[in-house]
Structure formats: C-alpha cells, structure tokens
Amino acid sequence: INTQVIANAPVKYLWAGIGDTMAKFYECTTSARGDGDELDHSTSMGVQISNLCAKPLVKYGVEALEECKNHRPGKALEEVILGIIVSTGFVSNLVGIDLNTGLAHACYNGFTVCRSTEEHGHLHGEIVAYCILILLKVDHQEDEFKKIYEFSKNMGFPVKLADIHATLDD
C-alpha cells in the first residue's frame, strides 16, 4: 500500500474511513454474541481479527490524521491504513453477512432520511462514528463508551445529535 498516496488525499476521507472501520469491530463482536450456535472457524477468525479494525485506530488515529494533514506518512498512518484496508477486508470476507453490519449502520441508515442531516453533506463514516456511541450505550458497554467518546472528541467526530444536524423534528 502506497501510504504517500493516502497522505496526499483529502484528510476528511481518512477521518471518515476511521469512523466507518471502527464500527466493524463493535458490530461484528456484538452481532456474534448470543446466537446460540458455535461460530465456525472462519467466522471465529473474522471476529478475532475485527479487533484490529478498532484498537490500532484508537491508538494511532489522531496522530495518523496529523501525518495525513502534513502529507508525511509515518507509522501511525500506516497502522491506520492497514486497519482500514487489510483488517476490514479480511473481516468482511470471513464473517459473512450476518456479522458484517449491525446497530451502528442501522442507525446510520435511519439518519440518511433526516432532511437536516442530509442537507449538511455529512460523510458516511462521520455518522457511523456517532452511531458507534449509540451502539455502546444500547449494549451497556459503559467503560468502552467513555473511551470511545473521548476518542471521538479528540478526532472531531460527532458526539451529540446536534453535531450531525439531526433534530427531534426529523
């Protein structure tokens, strides 16, 4: 992967890609729970790999954005790119349709019909990043919610409805 090409691309796409990629871990792991059936080998491997769709992004995300803004790829940008492209690619191919999406993307789909959200041209990953917070609250993952809430603030991701221009009237 030529990290310089990505470092020269608009930062907003890397930013949104981070938000979307992180959902892969949270949706995959929550969807895999409680099915009653034992997961087959490929699916289990995909669920385990999904950790690499979030952990490196949380660790390196802010620094990777800086490297991209400065058009100087380094370790942080490389780790984030690998999470977005390689880890997500493996997980998507290993876990099957039932674990490839979940509450964060369902909420995203709901926000796409909100006129106020649509009018402001929010990127897919931007709204999905907010919807990860919804998923964590609904799933009662309070410690993880706090961690991802702080990460989201540091990344400039939305952390409240007003940040995506959604209103109760929508």
Task: Indicate residue ranges for each PLM-predicted region.
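Secondary-structure boundary/capping residues
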Residues: 31, 66, 120, 160-161
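C-terminal charged capping/lid subdomain of soluble metabolic enzymes
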Residues: 140-170
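Active-site segments that bind and position negatively charged phosphate/pyrophosphate groups
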Residues: 38-150
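A glycine/threonine-rich phosphate-anchoring loop and its flanking beta-alpha core
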Residues: 1-46
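A short secondary-structure junction motif
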Residues: 25, 29-33, 64, 87, ...
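General structural signal for secondary-structure boundaries
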Residues: 9, 33-35, 73-77, 168-170
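Proline-rich low-complexity regions
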Residues: 3, 83-86, 158
